From Swiss-Prot:
PANTHER family per record: TRANSCRIPTIONAL REGULATORY PROTEIN YEBC-RELATED (PTHR12532:SF6), TRANSLATIONAL ACTIVATOR OF CYTOCHROME C OXIDASE 1 (PTHR12532)
InterPro entries hit by this protein: Integrase-like_N, TACO1_YebC-like_2nd/3rd_dom, TACO1_YebC_N, Transcrip_reg_TACO1-like, Transcrip_reg_TACO1-like_dom3, YebC-like
Species assigned in the record: Heliobacterium modesticaldum (strain ATCC 51547 / Ice1)
Protein name: Probable transcriptional regulatory protein Helmi_17570
Entry annotated with the keyword Transcription: yes
Molecular function terms from GO: DNA binding
Cellular component, GO, one term: cytosol
Keyword DNA-binding among UniProt keywords: yes
Tree of life domain: Bacteria
One record GO biological process: regulation of DNA-templated transcription
């Protein structure tokens, strides 16, 4: 897909994510609270909540935790002071970065995010400086190899099935496939792919870059990975998006 960034795939490779379940649960819980507060506790009529619940289950979040977060949000008590903010900036090498955050103290969060950018050689920018590079899309990740009897992905067949169900495009990598949709078509396409026998790993609305930068310099690549790791590990950051690919040879050098 034009503009598709492999950074999402690079993120999924990180084994240390398993050691951060507590932090992941906190971030997902925050999303559940805000989604329920804004759209109500019924996922059938609240698409944002439905996606958040799916993400919680994909990360093996206990059902009791999910329900407690929804009840807190629907009750309008806890989580009422969370503010949703978007930050934009440039990382090492001029890479565009978008950050979605939830915070109870915008001054603290802005200062800490600005520090992370500066430390990496990048800079936090003004609103609108890089948002035009990204567009919201539904992204459905599929297992490429058989999982519990699910269908093996054949690229040509998947393309036909995906387009018939309303998808925009697909990207097939060695370890997984991705199907891209309009945000409002995400759930319908996800269900159609599951009904067709594919193993759906995740489905979410995300920001996809319209164009990408190929990073071939090891030093810049290392700084970018450290910055993205630091952003994603920040307590207030829900999502971090960037428009770069790292050359395979450079990734091998980094290890």
């Amino acid at each position: 897909m034009a503009g598709h960034s492999k950074w999402a795939n690079i993120k999924h490779r990180k084994a240390k994510v398993d050691a951060q379940k507590g932090k992941i649960f906190t971030k997902i819980g925050r999303e559940l609270i805000v989604a329920a507060r804004q759209g109500g506790p019924d996922p059938n009529s609240n698409f944002r909540l439905k996606i958040a619940i799916q993400k919680a289950k994909e990360n093996n979040m206990p059902n009791d935790n999910i329900q407690r977060a929804i009840q807190r949000g629907a009750g309008g008590t806890e989580g009422a002071n969370y503010e949703e903010l978007t930050y934009e900036g440039y990382g090492p090498g001029g890479v565009a970065i978008m950050i979605e955050a939830m915070t109870d103290n915008r001054n603290r969060t802005a200062g800490e995010i600005r520090h992370l950018f500066s430390k990496s050689g990048g800079n936090l920018g003004e609103t609108g400086c890089v948002s035009w590079i990204f567009e919201p899309k539904g992204v459905i990740r599929l297992a490429v190899t058989p999982e519990a009897g699910a269908k093996v992905v054949d690229e040509d067949e998947l393309m036909l099935v995906a387009l018939e169900t309303g998808a925009l495009d697909i990207a097939v990598e060695e370890d997984e496939a991705e199907v891209f949709t309009l945000p409002e078509e995400l759930e319908g396409v996800r269900q159609a792919l599951a009904d067709a026998g594919y193993a759906v790993l995740s489905a979410e609305v995300t920001l996809v870059p319209k164009n990408t930068m190929e990073v071939t310099d090891k030093d810049i690549a290392t700084k970018l990975i450290k910055l993205m790791d630091a952003l994603e590990e920040h307590d207030d950051v829900q999502n971090a998006y960037a428009n770069f690919n790292i050359d395979d040879a450079v990734m091998e050098q980094i290890g």
